[in-house]
Structure formats: structure tokens, C-alpha cells
Amino acid sequence: MHISITGLSDQRFERPLQLIANLFFEESHIYFNKIDNADISIEISLEQIETEVTVTGILDSNVPLRAEHRAVIDLELSEKEQFKQLKNAVSHVYLMLLQELTGMTQKWGILTGVRPTKLLHRKLREGADPETAQKELAKEHMITPEKAALMQRIVDRQLAAVPDLYSLKKEVSIYIGIPFCPTKCAYCTFPAYAINGRQGSVNSFLGGLHFEMKQMGSWLKEKGIKITTVYFGGGTPTSITAEEMDMLYEEMYTSFPDATEIREVTVEAGRPDTITPEKLEVLKKWNINRISINPQSYIQETLKAIGRHHTVEETVDKFKLAREMGMDNINMDLIIGLPGEGTKEFTYTLNETEKLMPESLTVHTLSFKRASEMTKNKDKYRVADRGEVEKMMELAETWTKEHGYEPYYLYRQKNILGNLENVGYSFPGQESIYNIIIMEEMQTIIGLGCGASSKFVHPVTGVITHFANPKDPKSYNDNFEHYTNEKIKILEDLFSEANEPASI
């Protein structure tokens, strides 16, 4: 789909308009000039009188389509923020034209970002009441009432689960990345390396990780900075041996400040084929209070197609084993839109989930991530169309509501099927604090281990900077000391006395 757009000279419009085009068309390219082979031609004009700007768009078709939007530009804002307001006004017109042309309604409006609930949190922190905040978001971004209400439900749940969410900037959370898995799934782009035959690499990696944990723990103790949550992800953290897990958790309790006061420790035991009684005993020994066991689907043919070499029965058996051994906060992940699946298969998966009733359930919508096996071979992995994916999401919403689950976090991804979202549900009181913190970007998260990203949130301005460890084990093993020291330098500046929040 080739889209010609005339009337806009600023190249900063290109990316947001391309992202909106992607909501409607699987393969689309936009051009800021007239082209001969355009499938869609749109002319946009801007007229600004003092603070008011009028954006008009005309889409050339058999019957030309026209849309108009007026907006007020706050001239006291920075040039960057003024452009943002102008960009939103242009996006309104562009979206209206494409919706009228295709007959498709985008429930998230012009929003293409990952964290829509963050916008609602911002308005509430600025003093808006919930009803006003919802109306403003709907107007500013063309969000449907249905999605605005979902955002409000999630924000309410988050603030009930973490009442001090807005004042956690003086603490940190820790993400620990363990980059090994039994096999790599077809949809995955996380740092994940088949563990078989890599014991030498595993040993070197674990040596580097222990170093990072010691050094970072020492610095946090010296500065008197508390840890809110710890999350072991990957990869599959339970791919390593029970003895190796035991040594890691001992390191956490020895090196991290006030480890017994950490509010939540999560371990992704996502692949059932990595779970053993010995590993569950280790988790129990160290009071690990939240784990994930992820079926993704209860259709065996699907698991085989996506490269998960475990059986459905193994998922059920390992879940029951974890329950018998005292694990009382288990999350499970399901994915909507996996190859070969439709509403029938997803209904079956929900029915099987009902037999287990985990404390939380994360419902993902399949996303075609650029580097995944599935994206590189789309012809091989046939997936449901937009309409069927929406029906599956509706099934998930209905099922979770009927079974007492509440939505508590939400995020979106680029190239996600049906322009939908990923939603975390839980029983009230069983929400993952880490998931809330990372999605709403309320505090610094320090990434340790291979492929782990750190997200540094400035305690006063809220400005976010990123820092990533190498994704491949060899690069990590060769340079972990350097990356540890670099993170500590950033933290030294971030948590200097000059940067302390005045309100805390």
C-alpha cells in the first residue's frame, strides 16, 4: 500500500503517520510527495491564526473524502511540545480519513505508543479527577469510551495494589536476565540461547552475574537505597540447575540491601520442561513468592509449530506440582492469535485454564517482532485475521471477568495483531508490583545479566534514559565489569543529593 501525502514539509510527521498507516494496512509505505503509483493520495493543509490551528485533509477517491480538526497550540510550551500538539492535530485528520476509507474503527485512536495508561496516570498526578481525565484523553487521542474505561479500571487497580506508586522514585527495582532456554520459540526476540551444550558459557555467565549482583548490592547498601522488587527473567531462569539457582538466590540475600524487606521476588519458570521438584524446593527455601508457568496454548499442535518442546500435560502436571509444594502466587501466560488458532482453539485453552485457576493470567496478542523466526517466515505461520483476533480478545475479557480476575496492567506493541493490546489480569491482591512499576515507568529499574536493559528514571524530571548489557553471552562474559561500572556511574549522578525529589 503506497500512500502519497502532500502539504507537509516537516519530516518529523513521517514516523507518526507511518505508524497510523500500519494500523490499517499490513504492508504500507508513505511518501511526502506525489507519486505515480499511489494507492492513496492525501492532501493536508495547515492554517494557524495566533494560537488556533485548523488542519484540513482531502483524500482523493471516486468520492473525495474530507476531514477537519481544530486545535489550540500553547505558545508558552517549548517548540518540541508545540510540534507534538500540531502532530496530534494532523494525526486526527489522517485517522479520520483512513477510518472513513476502510470502514475500520481504531479503538485506541491515534495512540500507537506502548503505555497508554501512563497518560492517564499523568493527568491524575496533575490534579484532574478521573472522569475529566478520561474525557480529555478520549478527546485528545480519539480513544473510544470502551478503551478509556479499561484504562481507568487498570489505573484504579494499580493504585489499590501499590498506594505509594507515585512516591517510589527513591527506591529501585532489579531485573536479572538469564539468557538460556531449552529451545527458542518462533515468536521470540528476547535474548534466549538453547542451553544444551553451553555449560562453559553458562558457568562464565553466572560468574559475571554474581559479580554484578555483589557490586550493585554494595553500592545500593552504601547509598541507603531500598529495593522494591526483583524479577528474574530471560530466557528461562529455571533453565539452569537447582544448585546454580540456589547460589544465585543466596547471592541476592547476601548482597542486596534489606533483602528480607523486598516487596516481591518473581521468577519466570515459563517453560514447564525446566521445572523440577528440586528447583521448586530451592524457590521455596528462599521465599520466592511469585512464579510464572506459561502454557501459551493448550493445543499440542500449536506448541510444536512454535518450537515449544513440551507437552500440554507437562504444563498441567508442573502447575499441580508447584501447588502441592506450596506455590500460591502463580502467573500463566496465554497468547491470542498463534498460528493455526481461532476462537475454537482459544475457547478450549480458556476452558483448560479454568481447571487450574492461577492467581494471575497475562493475555498477550501475537506481535510480529522484526527479528523473530515467525516474522521472517510469515507464509509458514498462518494466523487469524483481525476480526477473529478481536473475538478472541473479547472471549478473554468475558472469561476473566466471569472468573473474578481484574485487569491491572496493559501494554501495546508495534505490529500487534488487530491493533489490540496485552493485558495482565489477576485476582485482587495478587497483582505483580514489578509489572505495574515497569509499565508505568515510576522508578529506576536496574538490569543485571545478559541482555538486561536498565531504565533510569530521573527522580525530579521523570526523564528516562536506557542502558543495555550485551545480548550474547560471550560479549557479556568479556565485558561484565565494564557494564557494571557504567551503570554505577549513571546511578551516582541520578541519585545525587541535587536530584532528590522535593516531595519525598
Where are these regions (language model features)?
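Radical SAM enzyme core and accessory elements
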Residues: 1-132, 163, 424, 428-504
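Canonical Radical SAM [4Fe-4S] cluster-binding loop centered on the CxxxCxxC motif
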Residues: 171-206
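Conserved non-cysteine loop/helix-boundary elements of the Radical SAM core domain that shape
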Residues: 192-395
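Beta-strand scaffold of nucleotide-dependent catalytic cores
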Residues: 177, 292, 361-365, 436, ...
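Short, conserved phosphate-binding/catalytic loop or strand-edge motifs used
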Residues: 112-118, 155-157, 191
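N-terminal [4Fe-4S]-dependent radical SAM core
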Residues: 102-105, 125-126, 130-174, 223
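Short, glycine-/Ser/Thr-/acidic-enriched flexible segments
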Residues: 237, 415, 451-454
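A C-terminal junction/extension of Radical SAM enzymes
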Residues: 30-34, 38, 371-448
